[in-house]
Amino acid sequence: SSSTVSGSKTSTYYRSDGIKAFSLTVYGTFSYDGKEAKILKAGTDSNISKISTKTLDTTTGHGIYASWVLKVNYAGDLKGDYRVLEDIPEGMELGYIRIKWHGNKAQSVVSKTMDGLGDDWKQYSNTATNDNGRSQNTTYYYNKTTNKALIKLGEFENKHTRDECSIDVQVVCRVTDSKVLLGGQSKTFANKVTLQSNDGEEHLATSSSTAALEKNSLDKSHPETFNGQTIKYTITANTLSQKLPSNDGNKLTLVDKLGDNLELDITSIEAKDDAGNSVQIEKAFNPETNTLEISIPNEKKIIITYTVTVNIAPDISTKVSNKVYWKSYGNDGGKNDVIPDFSYNLIAGGSTTTTDNPHLTIKKIDQDNANPMSGVTFDIYECKLNGDKIQRVEGGTTSGETENGLYAVQAPFVTYYNTIYEVKERNTPDGYMKDDSSYYIICVDKKNSDDYADDVKQCIAYFDKQSNKKYKVAYSSTDFNLTIYNSQKGILVKKAFINNAMGTSHKPVSGTYTFGLYDNPQGSGSPLQVKTITYSTGETEEKYTKFINLNPKITYYVFELDDEGRPITNTSQEVTVNKLPYVVDYKVKGNSTSKAVVVGDEVIVTNSLRTKKLPSAGSRLTLIYRQLGLAMVGASCTVLLIIYKNRVKKIKEEEIGK
C-alpha cells in the first residue's frame, strides 16, 4: 500500500485592499485504525502527535485522512471577527476542525457560535491540547448535505507583526471515495477555503491546497512452508476497520479469484475479527470460474483463512497465483499473491500406498451459500480408458446418499488405485438447477516403482487434456475426493438498456444498478434482499444477479431502486437512476403480463430513455429533438416575415420617392 501527497502548496492571498489574509497548506496524509495513527506521506509536518485521534473517535473514526492547516492573519493586519468557509473535497467527509496554534499576540483569538445558518448546519465542538500546550476548545459547523463547513474566528488584533498575530486551524478530512477505498485508485483531493466577513456577506479571499491518497484495504498472504500439496491462505479485509462503502447491494463483498490449478476446500473457510472471535460471513463459490465471494461485516478488520490443493503432479515446479479484490471494482484494488515455483514431494520411495483400497469421498455443496447439501444420491461407476473414450465396467457400480453434505463410498463396493471412477448425481433437490454432468476421478500410484505404469500414464495424459474441471487426478489417497456443487434456481435479474428513440442502441451505461426483492406488488416495506449490477466504462456484456435462499412456494416481486433507494413500481413515470432520467420496465421471461415471480423465473429490467412517437413520421424521436425542430421552424418563419415586411416597406418608399 502507498500514499502520496502531490500538488501541495502554501500560497499567501490578499484582500482587495492589500491586506495579507491567509494561506492553506497540506500537513500530510495518515491512516487511523482506532489504535494508532500512522503517517502515510508527510507534508509540511511529520509529527503524528499533531493529530487528535480522540476527536476522530467521536466523529468519523477509522480510515485514511488528509490534514490541512489554515493560517489566518499572517501579517497581523486583521481585526475583529471573521468567518472561514470550508469546501470539503469531493470524495471526503469532515473529520474535525480545531484551533491548533496561537501566535504570541493572538492568545485571545477564539472560535464563536453562529445563529441562523439553517437546519442543515449542525454544531460540533471539541477540546484538545494545542501546540502551545494548553487545552483548546473549538466550535464549528458542518453541513453534510452540501459538504461544507464553517468556523467563526474572533478577537483578532491588528498588531502588524508577522506571524505573531496569526493562528493555525487544522482541518482533517476522511476519504469516502469508493474508487480509492475499494478500487485501489489514487485520487487528488482539492481543498478550498474562503475568508468571509463577520456576517458572511463579503468574500475576502480564497486559498486552496491538494493532496493525493492511495491505500489498499485488502491483503493476502501464504505461509513460507507448505504442507505437502496444500496451501493455507490468509486474507485480511478492511485492514483499518473503517466504514467502507457497500459494494454488493447493502453488503460489503470481496472476490477471491483462485488460479486454475487450485482446488478450494470450501469447508475449511474460517473468519475471525482482530480479537480472534469467529465472525459470521456469507460465502458463494462459482466452480466454473474458480471464484469465491465472501460478504463480511463492515467497520471490522476480518481475517479469513482457507486451504487449497494444488492440482499438479509431485516433484515438478509451477507458478501459483491467487488474487483478492473488492467486488465491482476489478483487479486493481486488490492483492495478487504469487508463488513463483511451488512444488511438493510424496513420501520416500515414490508411493503413497497404505492399503490396496483408497477411500473415495464426495462432498455436495450449495454453490450460492456454501452450505452442505444432504439427501443427494450419487451413482458411482468403475470405468476404464478405451482409446480416447472412458467406458463403464460391467457390474462395477454402487450408489449412496449424502449426509451433512458428505458421501463416503463404503464396502461392499471397493475402490482401487489406478482405476477410473465416474460420479453422477441421480436426483436434483427442489429449487436447484439439474446437474447431468459426469465427474471422473482416478487415484494414481507408482506401486513402489520409479514411475507410473504405461496405462496409468495414458489416463493421466487423457485427464490433463480435458479443459474442464470434471476430470481429476489424485496423486495421493488424501486427495481422493470430489466436491460437486449445485446452483440454486433463485430469481435471476438481467439488466437491459434502450438508449435511443429508435430502440436500436442497447449499450450498457456505466454505473451501479440496485434491485430489491419484495413480497408485495406495491414494493412497500423494506426489501427482503438487495442486489446490484455494476458496469464499468466500456463493458458491453450482459450481466445478471440472482436472489437466493428463497421459498419455492412464495410469490415475489422485483423492483429496481432509484437514486433515493425507493422501489420503481410505476413503469410509465420518469425516474432518476445513476443521475440519469429513465423509464424502467419489467418483463418476466416467458410471461409478458405478470410482474409476479417465483423461484426459477428470470426478470429483465430495462432502463429506457423517455421518448415519444411522431405518428406522421411513423418513427420514434426524442421529445427534446422534436421541440427543438418546431422552435427552429417557428424562428425561421418569423425571420422570413420580417425580411418580407422590410422589403415591401422599402419598395413603397422607393415608389414614393419617384
Regions found by a protein language model. Name each.
Residues S1-K658:
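Solvent-exposed loop/turn and edge beta-strand elements of beta-rich ligand-binding domains
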